[in-house]
């Protein structure tokens, strides 16, 4: 297996590194690449191997997993740097970044042309879910590719959903994030209203947490 993450330097304390650590703990032979040495060291200390480049990391890999910051990084890596041309046609690519659906489709189509199975599988669950191996994977792509990925995803997550064809995982993730944003904004406004009218924010939070307004945004404040 191989994990590529130019975002590990940013997310290794959050999701990328815990996900990789769970794979190592499960007995997978993992080769990792990231631009930030400290991020790589966390994983090599746990038993993973370090690669000097993304191209080196994917050499001979059965499964390639990437976690990158944005669409431009995903397209730049797989298409701009032609990483797809260096991945075996028998390999499976699991792209876990949260990116634009069109970007996910574009890369997936390029992979299909080369005979490479690829799914977009953005995650939800935060740092705690990544560390505990209870993430939710929201998958777009062919069902056959998802079933190939399932044994790997199950080492990192608890809930695995097939949202539809390529890019559908990203659409579903956007919908989830939109609702989360609404809940966060609404929770903040409700607490601000209470404080403005003399309520203790802790008391108000406790009240809402045991009432119909309870939501994850409130619980994690």
Residue ranges and their predicted role:
Residues 1-8, 12, 219-220:
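Single conserved hydrophobic/aromatic residue that forms the stacking wall/gate
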Residues 30, 50, 117-118, 160, ...:
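Hydrophobic beta-strand scaffold residues
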Residues 54-66, 71-114:
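Rossmann-fold NAD(P) dinucleotide-binding segment
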């Amino acid at each position: 297996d191989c994990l590529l993450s130019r975002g590990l330097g940013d997310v290794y304390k959050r999701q990328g590194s815990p996900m990789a650590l769970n794979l190592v703990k499960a007995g997978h032979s993992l080769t990792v690449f990231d631009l930030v040495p400290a991020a790589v060291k966390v994983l090599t200390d746990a038993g993973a191997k370090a690669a000097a480049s993304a191209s080196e990391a994917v050499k001979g890999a059965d499964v390639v997993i990437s976690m990158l910051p944005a669409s431009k990084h995903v397209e730049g890596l797989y298409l701009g740097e032609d990483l797809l041309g260096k991945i075996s046609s028998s390999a499976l690519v699991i792209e876990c970044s949260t990116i634009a659906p069109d970007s996910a489709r574009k890369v997936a189509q390029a992979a299909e042309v080369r005979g490479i199975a690829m799914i977009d599988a953005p995650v939800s669950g935060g740092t705690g879910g990544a560390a505990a191996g209870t993430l939710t994977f929201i998958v777009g792509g062919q069902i056959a590719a998802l079933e190939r990925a399932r044994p790997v995803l199950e080492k990192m997550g608890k809930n695995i959903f097939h949202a539809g064809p390529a890019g559908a995982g990203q659409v579903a993730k956007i919908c989830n994030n939109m609702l989360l944003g609404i809940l966060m904004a609404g929770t903040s406004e409700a607490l601000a209203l209470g404080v403005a009218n003399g309520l203790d924010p802790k008391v108000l939070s406790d009240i809402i947490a045991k009432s119909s307004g309870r939501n994850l945004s409130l619980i994690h404040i």
